[in-house]
Amino acid sequence: MRKFAYCKVVLATSLIWVLLDMFLLLYFSECNKCDEKKERGLPAGDVLEPVQKPHEGPGEMGKPVVIPKEDQEKMKEMFKINQFNLMASEMIALNRSLPDVRLEGCKTKVYPDNLPTTSVVIVFHNEAWSTLLRTVHSVINRSPRHMLEEIVLVDDASERDFLKRPLESYVKKLKVPVHVIRMEQRSGLIRARLKGAAVSKGQVITFLDAHCECTVGWLEPLLARIKHDRKTVVCPIIDVISDDTFEYMAGSDMTYGGFNWKLNFRWYPVPQREMDRRKGDRTLPVRTPTMAGGLFSIDRDYFQEIGTYDAGMDIWGGENLEISFRIWQCGGTLEIVTCSHVGHVFRKATPYTFPGGTGQIINKNNRRLAEVWMDEFKNFFYIISPGVTKVDYGDISSRLGLRHKLQCRPFSWYLENIYPDSQIPRHYFSLGEIRNVETNQCLDNMARKENEKVGIFNCHGMGGNQVFSYTANKEIRTDDLCLDVSKLNGPVTMLKCHHLKGNQLWEYDPVKLTLQHVNSNQCLDKATDEDSQVPSIRDCSGSRSQQWLLRNVTLPEIF
């Protein structure tokens, strides 16, 4: 009997422990689920503290997100909403971990504590919840608190409900002041940024796009350069966040900003002269002729002094070159700080529509910057893009007055001292179409790329792909590509201009109208029956098919 009672006690005790274990297991399991939901960015509860070690989960440490096959169709539909993989973005934590992609020399740099404060201004229009809030969290989690004055979110007339009251409720719970400012009507990036800058309080204004992720140590190097010289405007290295997988890929510290003949921003290799100026130290900032425009920091007072943005420009486009020219020509400095890295989702297409169409807006903006800042070189641009001259570009008197007040240098100074490797040839004999006398067709780059054959097509008189420059170096040039022949009878290809003559040296005879390739001693000829879309090169015969009319343009003296 005693033994039976003892067994009952043991059994009851064991049962209690089993029940207690089950309770604890269920409790912590549910807690983990709560944490997981919170990390994935559901707008409830407080935000997580800065990530100290890599999490486990989709996209952690910047790794790509792979969507299962059964969800591919849904993924494609969701992609159309923002022109990036929204499904992948929503699977990633709002405070995901990222690799430290800085150069080793950057990781040991020490910055003073008394750097200026910054307001981070982020403009958004119908942005995805996950990308917008991931931008905000990355700023908060990876910025020294005493340097981050506030974050200003400027809503450019978004239509999505979750960007209204739910957004305001969410950001109120963050540990840094986050203000949501609303534009009354769709105004575009330029005017929305001006609104954000006007309400900001920091000593420095940092502009970011709404689909960025800041990495460790991103802010201090930017603020340190501005503290060193308040007239220095600084950009981080822009890393790539894949629009397909949200993989985080480090950008290169060996590229800087330039522009092509059509005034489109382009990345080009950092020239040797800039490497020499830095004595080979890649951790030092790169002086860049232009900036991409989406991500940069500027002293708030200096921003006002040099004229903020041109408020006469519409929506987006051209404002980055305009402010770049203005900074350099009016006594400032523009740098890429190689120890600062910020990721950006690069999309292949824009999900937005613009009143009047994108082309019309960009033409107007480019016309304004050309008229105010490019002096006689604006004529070069107008030959490339004659449609620009037909747009109404508004009143520029206040911008011309600003240039006079600031005693800014001419554009020729900018090309000679800041951007001597510009694609714009400063010395040339001819600019325009190159027309074959027999066929009445024109050379055409066909929007082809480096190492592809130059084309020939019916002359259309609209500039663009049919504009070639016969330069003072006797190159036949289209933007940064030159006509090149490496063997007898061709083909005639387009290669990067190397300025070493050789295979890119052409002699034009204004009497015979021939374009003779000096190395091969052959002449440019019309297309052959075998390939009707490319010119040929043959032994010089004096035939009409080897005669070419070059458009000689009378421009103001710029030689």
UniProtKB/Swiss-Prot annotation:
It catalyses: L-seryl-[protein] + UDP-N-acetyl-alpha-D-galactosamine = a 3-O-[N-acetyl-alpha-D-galactosaminyl]-L-seryl-[protein] + UDP + H(+); L-threonyl-[protein] + UDP-N-acetyl-alpha-D-galactosamine = a 3-O-[N-acetyl-alpha-D-galactosaminyl]-L-threonyl-[protein] + UDP + H(+). It comes from the Eukaryota. The record marks 141 as: Not glycosylated. Changing residue 341 to A: Induces a strong decrease in activity. Disulfide bonds join 106-339, 330-408, 442-459, 482-497, 523-540. Its EC number is 2.4.1.41. It is an enzyme of class 2 (transferase). Residues 431-551 form the Ricin B-type lectin domain. Its cofactor is Mn(2+). Keywords: Disulfide bond, Glycoprotein, Glycosyltransferase, Golgi apparatus, Lectin, Manganese, Membrane, Metal-binding, Secreted, Signal-anchor, Transferase, Transmembrane, Transmembrane helix. Colostrum contains a soluble form. Mn(2+) binds at residues 209, 211, 344. GO terms for cellular component: extracellular region; Golgi apparatus; Golgi cisterna membrane; perinuclear region of cytoplasm. Glycans are attached at residues 95, 552. Residues 1-8 are cytoplasmic. SUPFAM superfamilies: Nucleotide-diphospho-sugar transferases, Ricin B-like lectins. One of its GO terms (biological process) is protein O-linked glycosylation via serine. InterPro entries: GalNAc-T, Glyco_trans_2-like, Nucleotide-diphossugar_trans, Ricin_B-like_lectins, Ricin_B_lectin. It holds the Pfam family Ricin_B_lectin. This is Polypeptide N-acetylgalactosaminyltransferase 1. It comes from Bos taurus. The lineage of its organism: Eukaryota, Metazoa, Chordata, Craniata, Vertebrata.
